[in-house]
Amino acid sequence: MDIIFVKAGLASIALLLAIMQVLLMLQLYGKIRIFPGSRATLAWWHRREGDVLLLIFVGIAYHCITRAVIDPLSSRVISHAVFGSLLLTVILFKLLVVRWLSSVMPYVAWIGSALFVLTTGAVLTSAGYYFYLWRAEGIRIVY
């Protein structure tokens, strides 16, 4: 099985889910109206998608840490490592804020925005690059 293809596919799904997270929160904040359902239903979906994203990111991170070879001379690889590390750190911080640090809740939208930016950066520097090479150059990266 091509683990890099699986990681790139999961990362792409994660980016789509992150876009859904943003749209759900925009509707919960009353900025747009796209999805049917009550606020409680949309909040439930936002939380469940977040749970799925956490599982996807932890699975991808595990394989990145245990299987990948880091090229310290590649700015793409280094930026991907930074995006990924910050992403997991901010996810942990958001979980702490939502569950136990209610004094920071007024900033949760900023934390969510940071998560979206970091997700986009991590996915584009990995899956985006993988699919670009595959499509444009006919090269499939393998471990």
Report the location of each language-model feature.
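Membrane-embedded alpha-helical bundles that constitute the cytochrome b-like, heme-associated redox core
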Residues: M1-Y143
